[in-house]
Amino acid sequence: MIPFSVLDLSPIVEGGDARRGLDETLALAQAADRLGYERFWLAEHHNMPGIASAATAIVIGHVAAGTERIRVGSGGVMLPNHAPLVVAEQFGTLETLFPGRIDLGLGRAPGTDGATARALRRYFEGADQFPRDVVELIQWFEPASENQPVRAVPGAGLRVPIWLLGSSPFSAQLAGQLGLPYAFASHFAPELLLEALALYRREFVPSDRLAKPHAMAAINVFAADTDAEGVRLSTSMQQSFVRLSTGKPGKLPPPVDDITTILTPQQIAGAKGRLLYSAIGGPETVKRQLTDFIALTGIDELMVTGMMFDNTARIRSLEIVAEVREQF
């Protein structure tokens, strides 16, 4: 059985606010902790009315403080938005507070629109600088030399696991060349999944951080007690994707019984294309879909995610997936 992990974006639902979203994230993480999931990751997004995890490192600390065993990390920190030294200090602090429980996943996308990226002081050469920034960040975690003028405190000498995240061959090749674990964002960017995984494994060079390739991929999961309820729960995320694609992001809408009453066939097809890798339905249906995804990819670890309006339904979905996991 491979490890199962969870990705959460701290969704803000219609009628709710950021405080509710963060409270529900903690409740979800506590359920994942209780159910034996390996990791609970949070994503950096900015200027998104429906996502409360913009200050990712702070939310990680909140979740780690409210859980006992599960690893907590970033899925991910968008490194070009930050100075590598600051990231090392933040995650060095988290590792000091919660030793052996912190992961640092790194991405190179802005996690927002162009205007917000500029407000973050992100300049567009930042993505081109990403490989250098990753190497610099790794170096900040190395033990400091006696005469080193600048060091990460806390951070220097701490072994915080660093992952590269991505949705393209670029990140896959870089992760392989640096000998780092790799996580692919197949939950919203399915097109290049298999190509990227193959490239990562082919390019992998053993490092002092990782002896052999370790690949994780994400899949949307809407697990419920019946197939019909799973399909209904998935309609919130379909609506959200359509709104985002038309430049109108908002809070997460409630599910509907019949998605065809509010979206056009073209909109539904577009959303389903982005959500190609999804497991939707009752326990047996979800088990079959997860089995197929793991067999297709040969991944070493599975990450599940899913934007649902009702947090009780999200927790129930994790419970069903945990039950399914034990049957592998």
Please place each PLM-identified region on the residue numbering:
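N-terminal beta1-alpha1-beta2 module of alpha/beta enzyme domains
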Residues: 1-70
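Flexible, glycine-rich active-site loops centered on histidine and acidic residues
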Residues: 3-18, 80-142, 182, 190
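Conserved, mostly hydrophobic/aromatic
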Residues: 4, 32, 36, 44, ...
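Hydrophobic faces of well-ordered beta-strands that scaffold small-molecule active sites
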Residues: 4-8, 40-42, 72-74, 102-106, ...
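Active-site mouth loops of central-metabolism enzymes
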Residues: 8-23, 77-85, 156-166, 274-283
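Acidic (Asp/Glu)-rich catalytic clusters
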Residues: 33, 60-68, 95-102, 176-177, ...
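An alpha-helical appendage that flanks or caps ligand/catalytic pockets
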Residues: 124-151, 192-299, 326-328
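A conserved active-site cap/scaffold subdomain adjacent to cofactor or substrate pockets
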Residues: 172, 176-191, 196-197
